[in-house]
Amino acid sequence: MGPSPHNAAMGTLYLVRHGQASFGSEDYDRLSDLGRRQCAQLGAWMQAKGLRFEGVLRGSLRRHQESLDALASQLPGLPDALEWPGLNEYDSEAVLRSVQADELLRPDTPEAYRQHFRLLREGLTRWMAGEVQPAGMPSWQGFLQGVTSALDHVRSRHQGDVLLVSSGGPIATAVAHVLEAPPTTAIELNLRIRNSALTEFAFTPKRHMLVTYNTLPHLDEAPYTDWVTYA
C-alpha cells in the first residue's frame, strides 16, 4: 500500500482579508481603528498557535499594508512582504459606473445600500462575461491572471506556511479557481467574506486545496465577537 496523501509534505497558504476599512467615506482605502484591532488580534492568535511563516505576499493597496502592519505587531520575525499588485481589489466604483450612468448614491441608507449591491452584482457579472469593461481596470481574465499568478508563485517557491494579505475579491476569486467553480461563484463568496477573515489552502508544487474559508478563529470568544464586520 502506498503512502496516504494526507502524509505527503504540504504547505499551508493563509489568505487574510484586510481589516475593516472606511466604507462609505471619501477614502475607503484605509483601516478604521477597529480594522487595526481585528488584524492585531489575528496576529496574536497566529502567534499563540505557533505559526511561523516562510513567506509573505500582499497587495499594494494601503489597507493591505496597514493590515499587515497590524498583524506584524503581534507576529515578530515576519519575513519582508513581497508586494503583488495582482492581489489588489477590483475598483467597485468603476464596476458600478459601468452599469449605472447616473450619479451613484452613497450607501448610507438601507435603500441605497441594497441598490449598491444589486448594481455591484450586475456589474461584476457583466464584467466577467466580457459585456462591460470598467474604466481603469483589467479585463476579468487579466484580474484572474493576477490572482492565479500569486498562487503559482507560492507553489513554486515555498513548501511551508505562507501568509497572503489581500481583499475579498481576489480571495474569493482564488477559492472559486481552486474549486474549479464558475467565475460568478466568486461574486457570492466575495459578498460574504468578513474583515480579517482567514482562508486556508493546503498546497503542493502541483495544486492548491481548500481547507477553510472565511473563518474568524481570533474573534470567536467575548469580548471579540462584537468585532465582526463585512466592509
Segments and roles (model prediction):
Residues 12-14, 19-73, 136-144:
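Loop-to-helix element that buttresses phosphate recognition and phosphoryl-transfer chemistry
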